């Protein structure tokens, strides 16, 4: 089929103009489109899957439908695995067999796509109104913040890598006592990766400020 790369499409929802830049649009023999997106990611993203990929690519499918009136029948991630190891691939059955993997992403119904896009735009519009009128803004979820939870690491003297990570201090201390002398518990504070590294407005965000003040 024909390939179209890096096209940005625009559409209007609830009076707002929104857009998305699609890495690859492949036109199939039946005239439908396959959307492909490139990601440099970890092996664990492939093993466990990422909900954010489904949201992103279904939004792209919605854009194509709105702008071109053409059906999208397949969504794919071309994943470049930065931490892939050939030795692991030999012995682990669920481990990716190559450093580059194509992952099929679930395609939602058109009504699901419509509802998702409208809901997200409405949330942003409500947040803007709340900010203007100095009202509390709905907080971002852990998924939206790419949050890594705080952990309690059981450490062994002379070893850099944790023996085990626990969610609670009590579990970590109990584990330490079982292991005996030479083991300690280190607290590893969680972090909202998207907020700290990728958000342009975190400096103005009350949720981000509170999270850091609590730390």
Question: Where are the predicted features?
Answer:
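Catalytic cores of nuclease domains that cleave nucleic-acid phosphodiester backbones
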Residues: 1-48, 68-74, 106, 110-118
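Residue-level signal for functionally critical sites in structured catalytic/ligand-binding pockets
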Residues: 6, 21-24, 37-39, 56, ...
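Metal-dependent nuclease catalytic regions and adjoining charged, substrate-binding loops involved
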Residues: 14, 62-215
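Short, conserved loop/turn and helix-capping segments at secondary-structure boundaries
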Residues: 50-54
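Short amphipathic alpha-helical face segments that pack within enzyme cores
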Residues: 55-63
